[in-house]
Amino acid sequence: MNNKSTNNLQDIFLNSARKNKIPVAIHLTNGFQMRGSVKGFDSFTVILESDGKQMMIYKHAVSTITPLRPILFNQPQQDEE
C-alpha cells in the first residue's frame, strides 16, 4: 500500500470520528491510553479533547486508535465542514 493511500485512510478514519463525535481510545507506544473526542488532526498530530482539556498527541507516539463505536467506511464522504 502506498503512502498516499495510507494517509487517505487515516484521514477518512479520523475525520469520521471527528465529524460524528465518536469517542476514541488512543493507545500510545509507551503503554498509556487516552480517551476522548478527536477535535482535529494533521499529518503529524491529533488533537484529543477529554474532560474539557485538549491534548496534542504526536502520531509517531500512537500505537492504536480504537473507536468506541463503529466507524462506517462505506458511506460517501462529504466535503470538509
UniProtKB/Swiss-Prot annotation:
What protein family is recorded?
A: Belongs to the Hfq family.
Biological process GO terms, please?
regulation of DNA-templated transcription; regulation of RNA stability; regulation of translation, ncRNA-mediated
- Identify this protein by name: RNA-binding protein Hfq
Which keywords appear in this protein's UniProt record, sorted alphabetically?
RNA-binding, Stress response
GO annotations of cellular component type: cytosol
Query: Is RNA-binding given among the entry's keywords?
Result: yes
User: What GO molecular function annotation could you give as one example from this UniProt entry?
Assistant: RNA binding
Tell me the CDD domains matching this sequence: Hfq
Q: Where is the Sm domain?
A: 11-71
Tell me the subunit arrangement. Answer: Homohexamer.
> Gene encoding this chain?
hfq
What job does this protein perform? RNA chaperone that binds small regulatory RNA (sRNAs) and mRNAs to facilitate mRNA translational regulation in response to envelope stress, environmental stress and changes in metabolite concentrations. Also binds with high specificity to tRNAs.
Q: Which SUPFAM superfamilies match?
A: Sm-like ribonucleoproteins
Domain of life according to the entry: Bacteria
